[in-house]
From Swiss-Prot:
GO cellular component: plasma membrane
Name used for this protein in its record: Cytochrome c biogenesis ATP-binding export protein CcmA
Top-tier EC class: translocase
InterPro entries: AAA+_ATPase (IPR003593), ABC_transporter-like_ATP-bd (IPR003439), ABC_transptr_haem_export_CcmA (IPR005895), P-loop_NTPase (IPR027417)
Binding annotation for ATP: 34-41
S-S bonds: none
Keywords, comma-separated and alphabetical: ATP-binding, Cell inner membrane, Cell membrane, Cytochrome c-type biogenesis, Membrane, Nucleotide-binding, Translocase, Transport
Keyword Transport attached: yes
Function, in words: Part of the ABC transporter complex CcmAB involved in the biogenesis of c-type cytochromes; once thought to export heme, this seems not to be the case, but its exact role is uncertain. Responsible for energy coupling to the transport system.
Gene: ccmA
Naturally occurring in which organism (per UniProt): Legionella pneumophila subsp. pneumophila (strain Philadelphia 1 / ATCC 33152 / DSM 7513)
Assembly description: The complex is composed of two ATP-binding proteins (CcmA) and two transmembrane proteins (CcmB).
A molecular function GO annotation: ATP hydrolysis activity
Keyword set includes Glycoprotein: no
Amino acid sequence: MLDVIELDFDYHDQPLLQQISFHLPAGGLLHLKGSNGAGKTTLLKLIAGLLNPEKGEILFERQSIKKDLCTYQKQLCFVGHRSGINPYLTLRENCLYDIHFSPGAVGITELCRLFSLEHLIDYPCGLLSSGQKRQVALLRLWMSKAKLWLLDEPLVALDELSLLTIITKIQEHRAKGGAVLLTSHQDLPLNKADYEEYHL
């Protein structure tokens, strides 16, 4: 599904990423690891087409993402440190905004129950905590048809139930042929044989 080939990126004229190469197949999960400042978030932004590399190429389904960036970006969903949530829209409206629904997608209320947010469904998201906004961003992810999920530190500061929910959704997405690339400082609660790791 995704091929990163000999990618280089400089930050303030200093090399940050050099010769980054890996393959992420359909159904795959790649855990991107590295210390703070190693370039994990930058690499996700490069893969999302939000930054341009100095050298190298990114292929999605064997085609360069540069060929039709707009179409490519509709195939992915990027959940980063910023939630991307509109504070003036309600939780429901944020989930519906610019979402490409899958046939038979689970209803918003049912998904909200996974994070015990159903009582806030018609509240403006500006009234939610930062953690709740991040959960809304994840709900949007789960409602999308995106094949490729790019998740920047999705497991930070989660309780055990929320962690289990996210891991379950990741596994469901993979079972349907989707692919997931995530960064995390912590080990994943999965068998090591069930995913790949890439160290920056």
